[in-house]
Amino acid sequence: MYLMNQNGWIEVICGSMFSGKSEELIRRIRRTQFAKQHAIVFKPCIDNRYSEEDVVSHNGLKVKAVPVSASKDIFNHVTEEMDVIAIDEVQFFDGDIVEVVQVLANRGYRVIVAGLDQDFRGLPFGQVPQLMAIAEHVTKLQAVCSECGSPASRTQRLIDGEPAAFDDPIILVGASESYEPRCRHCHAVPTKQR
């Protein structure tokens, strides 16, 4: 990261599932705590895989979080003494999340968001591409392909061990029972043109 002379900016952490997005978000939050900065973490209510009131990485790291149903609910919890606002699983938030993040950064907060940049079909996911475009810093993480060991930038959804079809619902909250990291070449979506 570069030294910022002004307060208020946006950082995006993105990548496939199992690439370490939540782990990196937690790492950054812990660093702010060592610096005696005030941080608050948000997560969408829909994300209840490991905990309803924590952001939890796949390897078990966790940090307390405020679950919210709508993007604009974040404003109800932010106070002036906050320095850092973090939002995990940002792809699950409604379309207002881009405006919310912009407003917070413009008010002088360091805003860190983490989420999937592609859905299980390999297409841009939710508002993450817009957030990447307006961010001062973007960190794109990769996992390791569960099939061949190459860098994995895609998320493979599995249903009964088989790749999910292109027209299956976009949102299905799950972990290793439903998803695997895959590279471009091992990623499969039946009925999708290659």
From Swiss-Prot:
UniProt keyword terms in alphabetical order: ATP-binding, Cytoplasm, DNA synthesis, Kinase, Metal-binding, Nucleotide-binding, Transferase, Zinc
GO BP field: DNA biosynthetic process; thymidine metabolic process
Sites where the protein binds ATP: 15-22, 88-91
PROSITE patterns membership: TK_CELLULAR_TYPE
Active site: 89
A GO molecular-function annotation: zinc ion binding
Stored InterPro entries: P-loop_NTPase, Thymidine_kinase, Thymidine_kinase_CS
Enzyme class: transferase
Alphabetical list of Gene3D superfamilies matching this protein: 3.30.60.20, P-loop containing nucleotide triphosphate hydrolases
GO annotations of cellular component type: cytosol
Subunit structure of this chain's protein: Homotetramer.
Family: Belongs to the thymidine kinase family.
Record-linked HAMAP family: Thymidine_kinase (MF_00124)
Protein name as annotated: Thymidine kinase
Organism ancestry: Bacteria, Bacillati, Bacillota, Bacilli, Bacillales
